[in-house]
Structures are given as C-alpha cells and as structure tokens.
Amino acid sequence: MAESVAHPSVLNATEEDIKQLLAASCHIGSKNLEIRMENYVWKRRADGVNIINIGKTWEKIVLAARIIATVENPADVCVVSSRPYGHRAVLKFAAHTGATAIAGRFTPGNFTNYITRTFREPRLIIATDPRADAQAIKEASYVNIPVIALCDTDSPLAHVDVAIPTNNKGYKSIGLVWWLLAREVLRLRGALTRTGAWDVMVDMYFYRDPEEIEREEEAKAAAEAAAEAATTAEAAAEFEAVAAGAVDADVLAAATAGQVGEGAWDEAATGDWSTVGASTSDWTATAAQ
C-alpha cells in the first residue's frame, strides 16, 4: 500500500490492518452506486458489485478518530445503530471510549425535543448506516451536530460530514470498523501505544445471534447435568458394593490396619458376660465402713 500524504506516516495502516479489512469483506460494496460515493470505488466487478478502495477506508477511519479525539468530554460523542448487526459494536465502542450509545430504535426527538426524557445534546454523532439511522442524522442537521457515518456504495450522503466507505451490511465488517475506530481513538488519547497490541479481541465487537447464545447455554447446562448424573451413579454403585459386602480384601485390610483391641473384642464376644461382675467387691460394705 502506498503511503498517504493526508496524514503522517505513523498513522498509515499496517499489513495486518489491511488483511483484517479484506478478511472481514469491508471492500465488498453493493451493486448500486451513489454518485457521491464514486470516489471511494476502486472498480466494478463483472457481476456488478462495486469494490471499495481499502486505502481510503483507512484514511477516513483515521480522520474520524482524530475528530473524535478532539471532543473534550467523551460522553458528548453519541454512537447510533438501528441495525442489529451494529448493536454490540456501538455498545462496546461506548464502553471502551466513554461515548454515549443508542442501540436499537432511535426515538424521534432525542436531539430536538427537550421535553422528552431521553433528550441529548451531543457534540458529535457516529452512525452505523445512513439509511437505517436517517432519523438521527436528520435531527442532527437541525441542531448543527456533525455526523460521521459508515457508508456503503449505495448509502445516501445527505447531512453526512465524514463518510467512512465500507461494507455496512455485514456483521464482521461493521464490527471490525468500529473496533479499528475505537483502537485509533485510544491511541490518539494516549491510552494505547502504537507498538503494543490491544488486549480486546475484534470478536467482541461482532454481532451474536441471541438464539445461538441460548443454544450454547443449553448445551453447557446439559453437559453439567450429564456430568453430575454420572458422578451420582458412580457414588451409588460404590455404596451398593459396600452394602453387599463386595469390598476388596486389600481395601479392607488397609482400612482396619493398626486398630487396637481387635482380637480382644472377638474373645469377649465368645466369653460369659455374667462372670464379669462377680469379681467386684461388696460396695455396701465399703460404704458402711
């Protein structure tokens, strides 16, 4: 990848970053093309799919991170995602950078109607999809809030100030772009070094199907129940073996080894118990003296 003149060389993407963007299909656009997104398209495939220029994707990620880092209060940055694939990504981004997250349906009036309970006055908005988050972007334009958005080749760019060209329809591409953006913000703030790796895996930003999580929990519970049942059955079998007298001779010898008076008990069992009290003296005579 050729070095960019838009920012210092230290901010250039590494080979690993480019491989991650390609592996997550961030370069795969749609068949439709918005005229203002034409500058971000590298070429058009034979099947009509537009290929996004990954170099420009990285440049816009760095630009967006530098804009976010200039906001003094991280809570004044509002990240929005109406698309389910971006819910987990925006929540993780907010947790790591201190931003405010709106995951799910955007309530109309959040940025314009001060009477509503959820009224907010952010200084910057980051949207996952300009089409799905159109209401949030429209309200931001009313109150002059700058907007950063993840834009596909067919995304409308009305009221979008900074467009990050990427595939905003795949859960892997959405999660990876949010992860790269969070990492770059933390690096610019000094929380991370550029030479060290971030201990947060990119998988933490990926969408997970709730049904898949339930299936994993059910499988884990079933495995624990099976292990407990096996332990109970083994203990019951050992108890039955002891009750039936089927104890190994070596085990019995080891258990009874060193016991005192073992033979005396056997002799006392065969003797006459009535003769034991005959050897005692007359206690009444002793008391009379």
UniProtKB/Swiss-Prot annotation:
- Main subcellular location: cytoplasm
A Gene Ontology cellular component where this protein is annotated is:
cytosolic small ribosomal subunit
What are the record keywords, sorted? Answer: Cytoplasm, Ribonucleoprotein, Ribosomal protein
> What one GO molecular function would you report for this record?
structural constituent of ribosome
- Cited CDD domains: RPS2 (cd01425)
Name where it's found: Cytoplasm
S-S bonds: none
Entries under Pfam families matching the protein = 40S_SA_C (PF16122), Ribosomal_S2 (PF00318)
Q: Which GO terms describe its biological process?
A: cytoplasmic translation; ribosomal small subunit assembly
Q: What does this protein do?
A: Required for the assembly and/or stability of the 40S ribosomal subunit. Required for the processing of the 20S rRNA-precursor to mature 18S rRNA in a late step of the maturation of 40S ribosomal subunits.
Q: Subunit comment for this entry? A: Component of the small ribosomal subunit. Mature ribosomes consist of a small (40S) and a large (60S) subunit. The 40S subunit contains about 33 different proteins and 1 molecule of RNA (18S). The 60S subunit contains about 49 different proteins and 3 molecules of RNA (25S, 5.8S and 5S). Interacts with rps21.
Q: Which family does it belong to?
A: Belongs to the universal ribosomal protein uS2 family.
The record ties this protein, via NCBIfam families, to: uS2_euk_arch
Under HAMAP family, the record lists: Ribosomal_S2_euk (MF_03015)
Q: Tell me the protein's name.
A: Small ribosomal subunit protein uS2C
Give the source species: Schizosaccharomyces japonicus (strain yFS275 / FY16936) (Fission yeast)
